[in-house]
Amino acid sequence: MKETPLSNCERRFLLRAIEEKKRLDGRQTYDYRNIRISFGTDYGCCIVELGKTRVLGQVSCELVSPKLNRATEGILFFNLELSQMAAPAFEPGRQSDLLVKLNRLMERCLRNSKCIDTESLCVVAGEKVWQIRVDLHLLNHDGNIIDAASIAAIVALCHFRRPDVSVQGDEVTLYTPEERDPVPLSIHHMPICVSFAFFQQGTYLLVDPNEREERVMDGLLVIAMNKHREICTIQSSGGIMLLKDQVLRCSKIAGVKVAEITELILKALENDQKVRKEGGKFGFAESIANQRITAFKMEKAPIDTSDVEEKAEEIIAEAEPPSEVVSTPVLWTPGTAQIGEGVENSWGDLEDSEKEDDEGGGDQAIILDGIKMDTGVEVSDIGSQDAPIILSDSEEEEMIILEPDKNPKKIRTQTTSAKQEKAPSKKPVKRRKKKRAAN
C-alpha cells in the first residue's frame, strides 16, 4: 500500500511554517521530542518512545563458531524491521531501500565504532564465541526512525546480561541465572544518532524531524556521536550541498543533544536496577497495569498564543457591534402568517375542481352557505373563526377547503352522497335534420 501523498496546500503550509520558525507540535528549531524508556521483565528488552515513534529492542545471544579471520572476537549482528503495524506504506518481507539504508547506518554507528568490546565475547579462541543479536522492531512511525532505533539499540545492549560460562579443558559449562548471576556486556561508549533536516536547499534547519517534515525536506544529515564529542559516523542524503560551517554547527548541536540523551539513559538504567534489587514491580508489567503502553494520548505542547489573542481583541474592538434580530410571527390575515425574514408562509389557493370532478367519477362541487349537510358536516357561522367543525364517523371521504380571504364565506366540499341528492337531470337533445331540396 502506497503512502498517502501530501497535497499542495499541506506542503505549502509546512514550508511556510518552517520559514516562520514554527513547527506543528509547538517545538522550537533545535528541540527534541519527549523521550521515554521502558524496560521489559527480561534483561535486554526495552521500548523507546521518541514522541509518537516507538521502537522495541530485544537482545539475544548464543554460542557459535567465530569467523576465520577473527578467531578471538565475538559477533555483533543488528536487524531492523519495518512492519505494517508501524505504517501502512511498509511492505512486509521485502527489503526496501529505506530498510537497507537504516540497517547499514546502524552497523556503522554501533559495530564499526567499537562501542562494544568484542574480544570479551570470546570463550574459546577459534572454537566458541558469543554472538550478540540486536533485533529492532518499529511499532509506530512518526518520523526520525534512525534516532529512536539507535537509542533503543544502545539501551538494550546496556541492559542485557549474558549467561556466565566456565571452561575446563575442552568442556564449556553454561550456567543458568539461578546458578550464577548473568554478566553484563563490556561497553566502552554509547554512540547516539542525531538527525538534522534541511529545507529550501539548506537555508532552514530542523532537529528531530517528524513524519510530515520528512516528506517535505530537501536533505537529511545524520551525525552519530558519544558524550565525549567523538564523531562515530556522518551520513548525508538527499543530494544537497552543505557548507563547512553548516556541518560544524550541526556537530555542536549534536554534542549537546547526545549529552542530554546519555544522561537520560543512565538514569533510566539506574532506576530499573534499583527497582529490581528492591523486588518491586518493574518492566512492562507496571506499565500495562497503569495503561501506559496500550493507551495513546496527545501530548500537551506549550504554545505561545499571546500575539494571536491580542490581535483578536483588536479586531473585536474595531468591529461594529452586531445588530439585534428579534423574530416574531406577524399575522397578516386569518389564513396567513410570517415568521422571520424570507418568503411569506400562507395557505395555498386552490383552483376550480373541475379536473378533480372528472377524476372522481363526475362528483359535483356543492357551494354551501351556512346550511346543514346530510353527510354529517355542520357549518354554522363560517365568518367566525372560533366556531368548531364537527365531523362524523362516516366512511365516505370528506374534504374541507379553506380560502385565504379575510372573511371566507364559501366552503367547497366534495362528497359522494351529494351526487345522489342533487344530480342534475340530463335530457336528450333532439336535432332536426333539414332536408335538402332536390334539384
Swiss-Prot record:
Disordered, as annotated region: 335-363, 391-439
Q: Which domain of life is it from?
A: Eukaryota
Function of the molecule: Non-catalytic component of the RNA exosome complex which has 3'->5' exoribonuclease activity and participates in a multitude of cellular RNA processing and degradation events. In the nucleus, the RNA exosome complex is involved in proper maturation of stable RNA species such as rRNA, snRNA and snoRNA, in the elimination of RNA processing by-products and non-coding 'pervasive' transcripts, such as antisense RNA species and promoter-upstream transcripts (PROMPTs), and of mRNAs with processing defects, thereby limiting or excluding their export to the cytoplasm.
The record's principal subcellular location, in a coarse class, is cytoplasm
Classification lineage: Eukaryota, Metazoa, Chordata, Craniata, Vertebrata
| Site of covalent link Glycyl lysine isopeptide (Lys-Gly) (interchain with G-Cter in SUMO1) | K297
Glycyl lysine isopeptide (Lys-Gly) (interchain with G-Cter in SUMO2) cross-link, chain position(s): K297, K419
Protein keywords: Acetylation, Cytoplasm, Disease variant, Exosome, Isopeptide bond, Neurodegeneration, Nucleus, Phosphoprotein, RNA-binding, rRNA processing, Ubl conjugation
Its recorded name reads Exosome complex component RRP45
Single GO MF descriptor: RNA polymerase II-specific DNA-binding transcription factor binding
Q: N6-acetyllysine: which positions carry it?
A: K297
Q: Which GO terms describe its cellular component?
A: cytoplasm; cytoplasmic exosome (RNase complex); cytosol; exosome (RNase complex); extracellular exosome; nuclear chromosome; nuclear exosome (RNase complex); nucleolar exosome (RNase complex)
Q: Where is the composition biased (Basic residues)?
A: 425-439
Q: Which disease is it linked to?
A: Pontocerebellar hypoplasia 1D: An autosomal recessive neurologic disorder with onset at birth or in infancy, and characterized by progressive axonal motor neuronopathy, severe generalized hypotonia, respiratory insufficiency, and cerebellar atrophy. Death in childhood may occur.
Q: What is the annotated localization of this protein?
A: Cytoplasm; Nucleus; Nucleus, Nucleolus; Nucleus, Nucleoplasm
Region ARE binding, residue ranges: 1-268
Summary of subunit composition and partner proteins: Component of the RNA exosome core complex (Exo-9), composed of EXOSC1, EXOSC2, EXOSC3, EXOSC4, EXOSC5, EXOSC6, EXOSC7, EXOSC8 and EXOSC9; within the complex interacts with EXOSC3, EXOSC4, EXOSC5 and DIS3. The catalytically inactive RNA exosome core complex (Exo-9) associates with the catalytic subunit EXOSC10/RRP6. Exo-9 may associate with DIS3 to form the nucleolar exosome complex, or DIS3L to form the cytoplasmic exosome complex.
* InterPro entries referenced in this protein's UniProt entry, alphabetically: ExoRNase_PH_dom1, ExoRNase_PH_dom2, ExoRNase_PH_dom2_sf, Exosome_comp_Rrp42_subfam, PNPase/RNase_PH_dom_sf, Ribosomal_Su5_D2-typ_SF, Rrp45
Question: Where on the chain is Phosphoserine found, per UniProt?
Answer: S65, S306, S346, S392, S394
Q: Which spans does this entry mark as compositional bias, Acidic residues?
A: 349-361
- GO biological process, alphabetically ordered: exonucleolytic trimming to generate mature 3'-end of 5.8S rRNA from tricistronic rRNA transcript (SSU-rRNA, 5.8S rRNA, LSU-rRNA); immune response; mRNA catabolic process; nuclear mRNA surveillance; nuclear polyadenylation-dependent rRNA catabolic process; nuclear-transcribed mRNA catabolic process; positive regulation of cell growth; positive regulation of transcription by RNA polymerase II
- Family according to the record: Belongs to the RNase PH family.
